[in-house]
Amino acid sequence: IVRRRILHDQAAFTRRAFEDPETVKRELIGMVRAYLGPDYDVETHFTPTYRPWRQRIAFVPAGDIFKGINAGKASIVTDEIETFTPRGIRTKSGQELEADIVITATGFNMNVLGDIDFVIDGKPLVFSYTVTYRGMMFTGMPNLLWVFGYFRASWTLRVDLLADFVCRLLAHMEKKGAKRVEVALRPEDKDMELLPWIDPENFNPGYLMRSMHLLPKRGSKPEWAHTQDYWREK
């Protein structure tokens, strides 16, 4: 019951963020202002350029980070890093931030399938040229299923679904005496529109946009879609 309620609430909030993004954005920022007070520069430090859920939203249990800021235990600096210095970091505005430890939490580049060079029957296979079957299997790539979770829900929710699918697929293959399984475009799929792995209007963090050219394509038909929707996939 608790799991279903959480999933329902997440789905409802995501849907509302897409249907009425400006209202949701105003409400979220309003809650931040309520914690930090009228004198805090929320416009600079807590007003992103993107609409809600086009990039990840940080959940703050009981407003603990805002309480820490108000108590002087934490502070926010919104800037770009110019370089590391002997004492910490210097930003592009010239401010030096002293630091004992620097934890990199953004700006990374994705590593897709471990940068493995796939060779199928002696022919190299370029992963980005493949088309995904429901975001888990790929044309021209036999006996492989990629475990890729949800952006807006627990990653393991989709892992669960994929594990169940693999078990059913293996049982079916054993029954048929098959040792190889591979998805392929049908004749009626040959002219379907091919789309990026994720629609940039749906989800567009920098690390994903920088790596989109490495990822497979999805199709405009349901079988070749990558929905990121737990209830539809379940």
Model region roles, listed by residue range:
Residues 5, 132, 143-234:
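C-terminal, flexible cofactor-proximal segment of oxidoreductases
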Residues 1-63, 137, 200-234:
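Flavin (FAD/FMN)-binding glycine-rich loop and adjacent Rossmann-like elements that form
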Residues 18-174:
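Flavin (primarily FAD) cofactor-binding/catalytic cores of flavoenzymes
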